[in-house]
Amino acid sequence: MTPGELRRLYLIIRVFLSYGLDELIPNIRLTLPLRVGRHLFFWLSNRHKDKSLGERLRLALQELGPVWIKFGQMMSTRRDLFPPNIADQLALLQDRVASFDGALARKHIEIAMGGALETWFDDFDSQALASASIAQVHTARLKENGKEVVLKVIRPDILPIIKADVRLMYRLAGWVPKLLPDGRRLRPREVVREYEKTLLDELNLLREAANAIQLRRNFEDSPMLYIPEVYSDYCRESVLVMERIYGIPVSDIAALEDQGTNMKLLAERGVQVFFTQVFRDSFFHADMHPGNIFVSYEHPHDPLYIGIDCGIVGSLNKADKRYLAENFIAFFNRDYRRVAELHVDSGWVPRDTNVEDFEFAIRTVCEPIFEKPLAEISFGHVLLNLFNTARRFNMEVQPQLVLLQKTLLYVEGLGRQLYPQLDLWTTAKPFLESWLRDQVGLPAVIRALKEKAPFWAEKFPELPELVYDSLQQHKLLQQSVEKLTIQIQGQQQRQGQSRYLFGVGATLLVSGTILFLADATEVSTGFIVAGALAWFIGWRRTC
């Protein structure tokens, strides 16, 4: 470790121990070095004994700064790793920090743009509209058309801080499999790698711009979701320029009610937006917390969501989508056998998993959920229960599903905050069943043919040549097989002859030895020489 890394590591240890987080170290033999090492820092003790463990963990991460705050936010979605009291506290972490100087923001934008700010913008406001750990936002107008825009600018010098802390996280992750019996299955280095990728993606605002453009295209003219326009000509890796929006924060229930918003429809549309993104588009906004969601002031009886901050997105492949949809439907039909089979078929748990045992475990954990009214059952907690059960059957962490679960919990919490009577299953079931029907049968075949038509139209003129090449390759392959067969037969014949010669040679050698012991020297010499010669010829035939 470098001196800088050692200083940072000591700071992390000091903060963790001052909040009593050594309580998280399990009392098992493998962690004995950690527990012994804890006594080396005898002067550091828990100064927050009046607070719960989850709250102390949250406060410690806040004290360590933005990189650890974001890590805690991501880990709050890993409810397969943490008990609810800790995960709930981590979910309260707020990514809000003081804004940096507006003059510095202006300078940073001008460096990125390659000229004076006034070349492209009027009315730049040096006072930040919003500020977070990675970036902050300022308002302005486009000089060419006077449209109101926001400029998102990355914090100067944030990259070295992120890289230094992530390097330390990798080192710490390397210790986890050695100290925890379940550490290897949790794939801690992969968790850190996923977190690093998320952070670095957020640092590249061109990626966020591309995500926003894709989402806007997916929901063009949609009555459910509006994504602000991105002015890509003005975007740089550290600067994002997009349309300024005006709306009611989705968490401001009083303002929405005063506006006369149809809260039931708004809540249902949140669910529909999520499932449309996941199953129709395979591309979903994965940071849909209330700070990134607004509701348009226009037509409150037919409410429209406005989504911002598209830095984090997720996607599922076709197989994952199918298994996920079938899992939900099988679960709500209480077909636990099918749920178990789907987990095995998808590869989420090992192929040699005992399906009967797995089914029984799922039934034991999930059946009590149905003691609640159907409208009160949480999709997110259904996934959580399934993943926690599958974990006992060596299910490896699926990062894409973790991101989906986090987003689903956001959507559920938001929907029930807007309309407590929201029946998520009634809203989602028709969508899931319709999507599954579209994946099979003649319509699915026709759609697949349409999708592949351009490819085959391009390849069709080359078809005769491809057929000829295939026939030639088949002919050459056949000749190679015949040649190889002859070689193998010859080799087998030589090996048979060699075995015969080895047998004859061994017999002659043994006979010669017996004759030699009987003082028949001349005869024994002939036998021994003949035996050695037979062995030599046999050896040569094997070469």
UniProtKB/Swiss-Prot annotation:
Pfam families, alphabetized: ABC1
Domain of life from the UniProt record: Bacteria
A biological process term (GO) from this entry: ubiquinone biosynthetic process
UniProt cross-references to SUPFAM superfamilies, sorted A to Z: Protein kinase-like (PK-like)
Record-annotated membrane-spanning stretches: 517-539
Protein kinase domain segment(s): 123-501
GO cellular component: plasma membrane
EC annotation from Swiss-Prot or TrEMBL: 2.7.-.-
Membrane topology (UniProt): Single-pass membrane protein
The keyword Signal belongs to this UniProt entry's keyword annotation: no
Any GO molecular function: protein kinase activity
Binding site for ATP: 129-137, 152
Localisation per UniProt entry: Cell inner membrane
CDD domains (alphabetical): UbiB (cd13972)
Active site: 287 (proton acceptor)
Leader sequence segment: none
Pathway: Cofactor biosynthesis; ubiquinone biosynthesis [regulation]
Keywords annotated in UniProt: ATP-binding, Cell inner membrane, Cell membrane, Kinase, Membrane, Nucleotide-binding, Transferase, Transmembrane, Transmembrane helix, Ubiquinone biosynthesis
Physiological role: Is probably a protein kinase regulator of UbiI activity which is involved in aerobic coenzyme Q (ubiquinone) biosynthesis.
Family per record: Belongs to the ABC1 family. UbiB subfamily.
The protein, known as: Probable protein kinase UbiB
